[in-house]
Structures are given as C-alpha cells and as structure tokens.
Amino acid sequence: MDKLDLSTKAQELRELLGEDANSPVDIFSLANQIEGLTLVFYPLGENISGMCVRDQEMKLIAINSTMSYGRQRFSLAHELYHLYFDDESGFNVCSKRLDPKIENERCADQFAPYFLAPYKSLRAAIKKVAGNGAISMQHVIALEQYFGMSHLAMFWRLVSEGYLSSDALEDYSSGVMSMARYLGYDDKLYKPTPAELQRRTYGHYLKQVEELRQKDLVSSGKIDELLLDAFRDDIAFGLDEDDQGGEAID
C-alpha cells in the first residue's frame, strides 16, 4: 500500500469534484453532484458499513445509516475510493471491521482520511489548536469537529502521522460525546441518522424519476411507486402540498 499515492489520489478526487486541496468538505453534497451516482442510506446491520456497485449501466453507493454521522462521512469517502480507483471489482460490500488481508479495503480505508483531512490542512489545524504542545483529548475533538470525522478515525489518523501513540486509545476514547458538548460542539457527529430518516435515496435515481414525470411517460401512480421504492414517501406524498403555499424558502 503506497500512502503517498493514496494521498495524491485523494487530492486529485477533491479537485475533480470541485473542491480545493485543504478545506473541510461536505462529502454528501459532493456525492450528489457526481454524474450518474445514486446514493442510498439504509440500516445495513451491525457488520456492514457500506457498499459500492459500479458497471457500465449504474453507479450506486449505500451507507449504513445506523452508524454515527462521522462514521457515515468516513464510509462515503471509503466508497468513493472503490468508485473511482478500485479496478479489482465492480461490487464491494465493506465490513465495519477492516480485514488487513484485503488490499483494496486497506487502500480505501487509508484513502478516506486523506480525502476528509488532507495532510497539509491537518498539519495546519493541529498547529492552530495545539501549537507545539502535546495533543490532548480536547484537541482531538476540535480536529474531528473541524474535519467532520469520527473520533476513532481522527485518533488513528493522528497515530499514523506520529502525533499520538496507539497505546493511548483507551485514554482518548472515554466520554467523547459529553466532552464535545462541554466544549460547545454539536453532538451530531457522534449520533446515527434519526430513525425516521434512516431509509433514503438521493441522486441519479430520483433525477430519472423526475424525468419520467416531466415527460409524462408513466402514470402518477407509477411515479409514486418508484419514489416509495426509493424510500421517498416524503416526495410521493408531500411534494404537491409543499409547493402549493408558494412560500420562498430561505
């Protein structure tokens, strides 16, 4: 596994998707802009973090919506590696526990933190929050909040860069959410998607359904059926009501 090559790939993909080399990214918005990509959020169970399916006819990424928001962001970055750089398979089901024997999974797991927190940006952020001193638990939380990464992902990233020791994992893993709140941060990063929103589809599939609707190629009942298949009852049953008021949304 070539870490420099993976870091370079992460930078290249950020640029391809219209992001600069250093800023924190709204990775879900970026994914929604990828031509032909359907993004599905679904409770995938205790063992699966996500999956990527790609061939000449479709591109699909699924994310386990019962994981924390920070872990979902990491998993999406992981799946983007499979989508753009993994030539071994067109179908990847990714376990929450990394199998070190599977090279493309190791590469995807290394790619993800490089995409979310590029090296130069991470180094600058560390300098800002910790100066030249040791990195404390509070500093780790500040960094993960800035880059939108799960606590463990940020901890291991700092270990890989030599800022922390893996022996400190237990000391840095207790009371994370309560400390984040105490420090004034939103705790969204550490929580799963609310139960009522854990089944959702975005991206290309919905654009295709809308194209069918605009061209009047299928019945309104069929449109509703397609939307319900994508867990978008909010659109199937709420779109007309939302539009009738004519109120501008700020």
Language model feature labels by segment:
Residues 1-250:
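Active-site hotspot residues in diverse enzymes, especially metal/ion-binding acidic/histidine motifs
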